[in-house]
Structure formats: C-alpha cells, structure tokens
C-alpha cells in the first residue's frame, strides 16, 4: 500500500507530440507560439554550425527590453490611462514576480487585455470580486481565479462594474506586487513605460544571452516523417526530448563506468557532429520575439546546410497563472509548461508540448 501511495503522489507529466509542415495552411505553429504568453527561457541548437549569421545574432541580441516595477499597486493596471496608453496601442504583458502560484496571490495581464488573478481564499473574499474556484484546489478550496476584461471595462468607465472593481483595488483590498512588464507596440511610437511608472521603482532590463559551441556532440538520427522512429534507422521524438534536456543542462553524455552523476547517453542510432551552436536567452521574453526567431530558423535551410535539423525550445514561468491562452496553470511539484520545435531541412517540423500534473492538456 505504501508503494501504491507513493506512486499516486508522484507528479505526472504530459507530453504531446505532433508533426506538420510550415507550408501547410492548417499548421498551428504560429498560433501556439503567440498564445504561450509568459516565457523565461528560449534555447536553440544548430548542429554543424560554429558561428551565427549576423541577422540571427541581431535577433538574439534584440529580444528585450522588459521592465521590473517594485510594489506596484494593482489598481494602476486598470486605470483608463494605462488601458489607453498600453493595452489599446499594442500587446502589454505583466506578471507578478517572486510569487508562488500554489501559495501566494499572483496576477497576470494577457496581451488581449484580460487581467487574471489567482487569489487565496481570504484575499478573494476580501476583494468582493466574482470568480470561480481553482480547478486544482482539491476538496478544500483554497484558491480562486478572477478574470477581468479590461477592454470591455474601458467601453464604459462609468459603469457600476468598473466602479466596484476600482473601489476594491483602491480601498477595500489594496494589493501591491512586484511586476515584470513588457510592451510590444504596433507602431513606431517609442515605449513610454519608464516615464509612465516613473513615480515607482522601475528598472529596464535586457534578456541575458549565453552563446556556446559544443564540440564532437553525439546527436540522435531523426526522420521527419517518423515521430515514433524506426528501429536501427531513426530515434523517437520522446528520445530526442530527453536528449535535448540533457544537452541544455550540460550533462555529460558519455555514460562512462566511473560517472556517478549521470548514466544517461545519447539514444541510438546517433551520429557525431564536429560542432553545434547552442544559444540560450533568459528573461521576460515575448511571443512576438519568439515568432521572429522561429521564422528565421524556418529559413535556415533556404541555402544548403550540413545539419538535417535544428531545434527551438521555450520554457514558461513556473508560477504564471496560465500556460497557453487562458488555460489555468498550477505548480504542484514542477510547474513546467514548455514546448519544442524540431525544424527539418524539408520544412517539416515536430512540435512537442509538455505540462505538469496541474495543467490542462496542451492545445
């Protein structure tokens, strides 16, 4: 019984794999990138490559900026000025920083103007707002989700609904958070976020970029048409997923007898490439920037290359209230929600999407 209990308590994970072609008009690749809003790490691996092109390097170095605002009152995100300045003129993203989704109150502003609040029971009751229990609360409901459509509210700022929400955030239950903010503007107008929040402690940040060349890297052999692989011919998509995790974590893949840290090795069949280029970007990275990277990698094979494939991997913030679109996200024991593209030289691609136990199935 004890063993069975431990198995039940073990965190479950879900990995969804699909294949398509970038030229297919039904391809979902762009939509899935655009609706995974809160990304903290982006990595791409290019086998048989020792240096990045200037165009790709410029894309990598221009994935920012984003902003950190300390002790920002929540009511600042629902003012008419904020809505008209940022939400209506572009895509605005906000996420509470250093809050734990399973323990603390957390907030996220989606680019479509939806404000998502994940509140503990006491805070939820004190705000007086309407919401619903978290889907991951269990029998004893301790977390509630509140969704506020700021675009809808802005249509009638004299409404009782807007007055009630504004009163709740300003007077009834004032809430303050440290926020990460970013704004993707649609026009040529310069960002005014620094000046707009100048009365608060605000800092501008650029994502951190790590570039490295991996020598004599043992890589799985893949066939774009075979997600499940073919014995002695090509590896499975799941095997590649595990291998990428090891590469990104800088795990030694030699599987030598005296290696007591890891016995993992590259799946077979495999091939050794003389060099591979690994780039990792860390920060508050917008989907719009990831779309540009993906588009550029799609055109990587426009000219003949030795590499048969490249990968683009994206990890979301573990404590964001949502994963894809408005899908509620929970932490439990991992909080992972991530996706990976394997881009082949014939424009086929594999898309792998992974979530933890407290998540819906990826879209």
Curated annotation (Swiss-Prot):
Keyword rRNA processing: yes
Gene Ontology annotations of biological process type: endonucleolytic cleavage in ITS1 to separate SSU-rRNA from 5.8S rRNA and LSU-rRNA from tricistronic rRNA transcript (SSU-rRNA, 5.8S rRNA, LSU-rRNA); tRNA 5'-leader removal
Keywords: Nucleus, RNA-binding, rRNA processing, tRNA processing
Subcellular compartments: Nucleus, Nucleolus
One cellular-component annotation, GO: nucleoplasm
Broad class of the protein's primary localization: nucleus
Subunit structure: Component of nuclear RNase P and RNase MRP ribonucleoproteins. RNase P consists of a catalytic RNA moiety and about 10 protein subunits; POP1, POP4, POP5, POP7, RPP14, RPP21, RPP25, RPP30, RPP38 and RPP40. Within the RNase P complex, POP1, POP7 and RPP25 form the 'finger' subcomplex, POP5, RPP14, RPP40 and homodimeric RPP30 form the 'palm' subcomplex, and RPP21, POP4 and RPP38 form the 'wrist' subcomplex. All subunits of the RNase P complex interact with the catalytic RNA. Several subunits of RNase P are also part of the RNase MRP complex.
The protein's role, per its UniProt record: Component of ribonuclease P, a ribonucleoprotein complex that generates mature tRNA molecules by cleaving their 5'-ends. Also a component of the MRP ribonuclease complex, which cleaves pre-rRNA sequences.
Designated name of the protein: Ribonuclease P protein subunit p40
Native source organism of the sequence: Homo sapiens
């Amino acid at each position: 019984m004890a063993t069975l209990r431990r198995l039940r308590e073990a965190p479950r994970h879900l990995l969804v794999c699909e294949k398509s072609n970038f030229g297919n008009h039904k391809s979902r690749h762009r939509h899935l990138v655009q609706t995974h809003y809160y990304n903290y790490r982006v990595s791409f691996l290019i086998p048989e490559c020792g240096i990045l092109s200037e165009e790709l390097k410029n894309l990598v170095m221009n994935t920012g900026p984003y902003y950190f605002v300390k002790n920002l009152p929540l009511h600042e995100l629902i003012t008419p000025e904020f809505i008209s300045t940022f939400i209506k003129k572009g895509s605005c993203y906000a996420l509470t920083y250093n809050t734990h989704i399973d323990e603390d109150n957390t907030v996220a502003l989606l680019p479509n103007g939806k404000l998502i609040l994940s509140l503990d029971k006491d805070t939820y009751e004190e705000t007086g707002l309407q919401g619903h229990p978290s889907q991951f609360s269990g029998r004893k409901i301790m977390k509630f989700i509140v969704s506020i459509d700021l675009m809808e509210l802005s249509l009638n700022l004299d409404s009782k609904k807007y007055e009630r929400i504004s009163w709740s955030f300003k007077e009834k239950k004032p809430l303050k958070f440290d926020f990460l903010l970013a704004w993707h503007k649609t026009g040529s107008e310069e960002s005014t976020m620094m000046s707009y929040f100048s009365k608060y402690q605000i800092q501008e940040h650029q994502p951190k970029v790590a570039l490295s060349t991996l020598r004599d890297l043992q890589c799985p052999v893949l066939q774009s048409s075979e997600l499940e692989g073919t014995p002695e011919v090509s590896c499975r998509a799941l095997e590649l997923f595990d291998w990428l995790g090891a590469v990104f974590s800088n795990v030694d893949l030699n599987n030598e007898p005296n290696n007591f840290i890891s016995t993992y090795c590259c799946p077979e069949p495999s091939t050794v490439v003389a060099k591979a280029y690994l780039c990792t970007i860390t920060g508050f990275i917008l989907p719009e920037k990831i779309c540009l990277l993906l588009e550029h990698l799609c055109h990587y094979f426009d000219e003949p290359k030795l590499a048969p494939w490249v990968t683009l991997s994206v990890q979301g913030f573990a404590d964001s209230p949502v994963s894809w679109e408005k899908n509620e996200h929970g932490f439990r024991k991992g909080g992972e929600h991530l996706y990976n593209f394997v881009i082949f030289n014939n424009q086929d691609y594999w898309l792998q999407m992974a979530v933890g136990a407290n998540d819906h199935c990826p879209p």
